Regions:
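Short intrinsically disordered terminal tails
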Residues: 1, 85-86
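Short, basic/aromatic beta-hairpin or loop at an interaction surface
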Residues: 18-35
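Short beta-strand-centered aromatic/proline hotspots
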Residues: 21-25, 62-70
Length: 86
């Protein structure tokens, strides 16, 4: 999976099912050497600490952890931390 860009569409698989997300920010994670923080807008009952899968276009999956959730109207701004494979 490549590092996403702002405005990229993403698919997340969670314990409540699949949901679509839009990437709004991509940052290096200072807590981990290879880590990335992804801010996405998505719908669903996300909770801090929740584990999710990010599904790439080719169907491969990368695990991520919900670091922060900010409620916005119907959508939520969700910050995910992950390590993307090289």
């Amino acid at each position: 999976m490549q590092r996403p860009n702002v405005d990229d569409d993403m698919t997340l698989v969670t314990d409540f099912g699949k949901t679509e997300a839009i990437c709004v920010d991509v940052l290096d994670n200072p807590a981990t050497e290879e880590g990335v923080l992804l801010k996405v807008m998505a719908r669903g009952p996300f909770e801090q600490g929740q584990q999710v899968w990010i599904v790439d276009r080719d169907g491969s999956k990368v695990g991520a952890t919900v670091e922060n959730v900010s409620e916005q109207t119907i959508d939520s701004e969700v910050t995910l931390s992950t390590v993307l494979p090289a």
